[in-house]
């Protein structure tokens, strides 16, 4: 899991328009109180996974914080390593995730894990360098690094910003696959790259709908569902007095 935390941090930096080769990491680890070999094994295995990625990508972690007291009575926090990726980039090269223009194509720059489910580092490096190059050439105009919600989460959140419609067609098994390392991109032209798969296009935005495998979803309903979970804790509206 920690290996993919590092991968996700890199993917997010790339999707914003920066070069992953110049980035640095900071880690936040949070684990239960250490009491036996099993509990000690959780942070050890997580840090080994993160270190393996650092070595293979040739990138250092320059800071972080650990918390090893995530236990209250018989309740333990879920074991976690969170990776933050930082770098600098020319402001003119930075892009944002929301869909930009009707008629643009949507491609998935896909990462395929190794047989043991570990990241394919060589493929990731090639994919990220290609995406960075296409952003510099202003062919890729928006991008979203896939996370726990897969392609479904990515296309929904990309549609929220400008309310543009989109149509995508993908294997249903791929819709909610984690997809860490993969990036969904909006392209003004076309992509000629082995790991770039055409999955859809941006449409006019008049209906405020996403069409996924022929099924239509109202964008505003999706936005409400996305914010509902934390609305009581972090309300985004309030009554006027």
Q: Language-model segments: what does each one mean?
A:
Residues 185:
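Catalytic core of tubulin tyrosine ligase-like
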Residues 43-45, 60, 66-177, 188-241:
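Intein/HINT protein-splicing elements and their conserved insertion hotspots or analogous self-processing inserts
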Residues 1-66, 70:
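A glycine-rich phosphate/pyrophosphate-binding beta-strand-loop-alpha-helix module
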Residues 179-181:
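A structural-propensity feature for long, helix-poor, extended segments
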């Amino acid at each position: 899991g920690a290996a993919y935390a590092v991968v996700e941090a890199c993917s997010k930096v790339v999707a914003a328009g920066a070069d992953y080769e110049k980035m640095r990491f900071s880690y936040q680890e949070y684990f239960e109180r250490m009491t036996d070999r099993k509990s000690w094994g959780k942070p050890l295995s997580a840090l080994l996974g993160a270190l393996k990625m650092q070595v293979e990508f040739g990138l250092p972690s320059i800071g972080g914080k650990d918390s090893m007291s995530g236990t209250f009575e018989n309740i333990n926090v879920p074991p976690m390593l969170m990776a933050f990726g930082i770098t600098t980039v020319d402001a003119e090269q930075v892009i944002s995730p929301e869909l930009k223009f009707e008629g643009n194509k949507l491609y998935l720059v896909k990462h395929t894990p190794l047989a043991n489910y570990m990241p394919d580092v060589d493929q990731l490096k090639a994919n990220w360098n290609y995406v960075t190059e296409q952003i510099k050439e202003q062919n890729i105009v928006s991008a979203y690094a896939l996370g726990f919600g897969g392609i479904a989460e990515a296309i929904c959140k990309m549609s929220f910003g400008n309310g543009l419609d989109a149509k995508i067609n993908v294997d249903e098994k791929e819709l909610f696959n984690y997809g860490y390392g993969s990036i969904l991109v909006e392209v003004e032209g076309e992509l000629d790259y082995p790991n770039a798969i055409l999955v859809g296009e941006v449409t006019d935005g008049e209906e405020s709908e996403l069409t996924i495998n022929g099924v239509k979803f109202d964008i505003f309903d999706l936005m409400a569902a996305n914010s509902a979970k934390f609305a009581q804790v972090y309300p985004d509206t309030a009554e006027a007095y």
